């Protein structure tokens, strides 16, 4: 599994970590090809200059304590890409937070990159990660997503969401 995960990370990082092409067309098209999983979820969308990660962590914890199954999407990661995509579940008291497994992460990176490649869509690294997150949280049937923006602004890939319960600016 570790080798498959490393190959997924290699594919992900080859997609243009420092490549920026403003617009939501690419991510929107890929999400449409995936069945628009982002439209089946509800969000607390967190943006701002400083403190986004802290606000996201606190908000996700409060929602979990309130009995919600929470998807948490933050960046950057410290050790592994899987740290960015977590599920906080009130049903599991021993481990209230679970990172996406390397197996699920790899499967979704390969699936999304294959769809993008077949349709001549050139996604950035952040767009791929965001697509992985949307699909994974749909699969996990989370009640709500706490979503941290990437670069922020109108063309941030996280801005394709439609069911925004609350927008928070730090």
Task: Please give the residue ranges for each predicted region.
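Gly-rich Lys/Arg/Thr-decorated short loops/hinges at beta-loop-alpha junctions or inter-strand turns
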Residues: 10-11, 111-114, 165-169
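Short beta-strands and strand-loop turn motifs
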Residues: 41, 148, 167-170
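Conserved beta-strand segments that form the floor/walls of ligand-binding pockets within enzyme
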Residues: 45, 86, 168
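Residue-level signal for inorganic ion chemistry
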Residues: 12, 49, 70, 146, ...
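Generic secondary-structure boundary signal with a strong preference for alpha-helix termini
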Residues: 60, 162-165
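ATP-dependent carboxylate-amine ligase catalytic core
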Residues: 24, 31-39, 65-162
């Amino acid at each position: 599994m570790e080798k498959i995960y490393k190959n997924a990370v290699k594919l992900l990082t080859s997609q243009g970590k420092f490549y920026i092409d403003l617009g939501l067309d690419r991510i929107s098209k890929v999400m449409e090809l995936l069945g628009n999983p982002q439209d089946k979820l509800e969000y607390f969308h967190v943006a701002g200059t400083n403190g986004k990660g802290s606000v996201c962590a606190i908000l996700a914890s409060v929602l979990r304590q309130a009995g919600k199954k929470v998807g948490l999407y933050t960046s950057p990661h410290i050790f592994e890409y899987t740290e960015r995509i977590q599920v906080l579940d009130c049903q599991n008291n021993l481990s209230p937070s679970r990172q996406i497994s390397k197996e699920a992460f790899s499967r979704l990176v390969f699936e999304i990159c294959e769809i993008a490649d077949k349709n001549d869509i050139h996604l950035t690294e952040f767009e791929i990660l965001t697509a992985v997150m949307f699909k994974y949280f749909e699969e996990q049937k989370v009640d709500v997503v706490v979503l941290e923006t990437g670069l922020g602004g109108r063309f941030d890939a996280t801005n394709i969401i439609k069911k925004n319960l609350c927008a928070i600016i730090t």
